[in-house]
Amino acid sequence: MASSRSVVLRVLVAVAVVAAAGAPRLAVADSPPLQDICVADLRAATAVDGFPCKPTASVVSDDFFCDAIVQAPSTSNPFGVNSTRATVSAFPGLNTLGLSITRTDLAPGGLNPPHSHPRASELVLVLSGEVMVGFTTAANRLFSKVVREKELFVVPRGLQHFQLNVGAGNASFVAMFDSQSPGLVTPTFALFATQPAMPMEVLAKTFLMGEDEVGAIKSKFAGF
């Protein structure tokens, strides 16, 4: 009887191993493309996994080219930062490829405020200047580093992170994402610049402030 149970146990273990080996893996980025090219038809409605493909006969070489990040955007704003995004909307050839890129410029002391990308990890390549890049984990631990020209820093998917110009002059970097639509969530705006407005009581209790103090903060984000 013991021998019989041992055989059954070995069979069950073998079945479990085979099943685990053949089980589908959880996707950690955009779904892989099912054809060589699928240039976005920007006139069509967006689908869950990207834009529909434009007819192959209508595809041209320029669909796979983009110069959106060549020029430095103006950084004349309270944060001293501006970004130019080369996502699928501006770069149709990215459709279904699971890629996008952003150029960000920072004035001296400029800050790209804490934010997250819920659908992508981010690889930062500094083009010029000195940029402190940092992210926080779910355990409230901060990882940060001053990144200089041609150096890289990676931010894991979905984590809050920031970029601060700590150099004497302007700074610029590109951020590469493993999604054609990484998404952007900035907590400051998500709390103080929502439409309709976040209830005052929620903000006052969250930040242990009086409503007059919350109102003063909200007034700074009017128009964002």
UniProtKB/Swiss-Prot annotation:
S-S pairs: 38-53
Signal peptide: 1-29
Residues binding Mn(2+), per UniProt: 115, 117, 122, 161
Residue ranges of every copy of the Cupin type-1 domain listed in the record: 67-215
Subcellular location: Secreted, Extracellular space, Apoplast
One of the record's GO cellular component terms: apoplast
Superkingdom classification of source: Eukaryota
TM segment ranges: none
InterPro entries: Cupin_1 (IPR006045), Germin (IPR001929), Germin_Mn-BS (IPR019780), RmlC-like_jellyroll (IPR014710), RmlC_Cupin_sf (IPR011051)
Entry keywords, A to Z: Apoplast, Disulfide bond, Glycoprotein, Manganese, Metal-binding, Secreted, Signal
Gene Ontology MF terms in the entry: manganese ion binding
Glycosylation: residue positions: 82, 170
Alphabetical list of PROSITE patterns matching this protein: GERMIN
Subunit-structure text: Oligomer (believed to be a pentamer but probably hexamer).
Function: May play a role in plant defense. Probably has no oxalate oxidase activity even if the active site is conserved.
Family in the record: Belongs to the germin family.
Protein name: Germin-like protein 1-2
Originating organism: Oryza sativa subsp. japonica
